Amino acid sequence: MAFMGRELKWGVAHIYSSLNNTIIHITDLTGAETVSRWSGGMVVKADREKPSPYAAMIAASRAAAEAMDKGITALHIKVRAPGGHGPKTPGPGAQAAIRALARAGFIIGRIEDVTPIPHDTTRRPGGRRGRRV
């Protein structure tokens, strides 16, 4: 498939964004071959800055540069929050990571939320009488 005169090579950007960190993992279309992987904790010194939008933006731009070097020109984006018992909404770094990938020059295909949501709910930790503080 060509877009504006150039041939497209598609990849998938898996963005996992929690309240503690943001992980950007770029793979080929099958998801089997890792092209690039960066996290907020790899680009900042202080632990408290790992979930920040700034850390996500820097991690995404470094992952994008690595993927561009390997020939990826277009991306589908899959955003994931912790889900399950944890929060169902992505952390503060998700939006910044998506914007950084778009600004890096990739053609963006689909943006999809792949947060695991239980349909019947598994048992929460803490037992029958709850967590006693």
Curated annotation (Swiss-Prot):
One of its GO terms (biological process) is translation. GO terms for cellular component: ribonucleoprotein complex; ribosome. PROSITE patterns: RIBOSOMAL_S11 (PS00054). GO terms for molecular function: rRNA binding; structural constituent of ribosome. Transmembrane segments: none annotated. The keyword rRNA-binding applies. It holds the Pfam family Ribosomal_S11. The keyword Cell membrane does not apply. It comes from the Archaea. Keywords: Ribonucleoprotein, Ribosomal protein, RNA-binding, rRNA-binding. Part of the 30S ribosomal subunit. Belongs to the universal ribosomal protein uS11 family. HAMAP family: Ribosomal_uS11. Located on the platform of the 30S subunit. This is Small ribosomal subunit protein uS11. The gene is rps11.
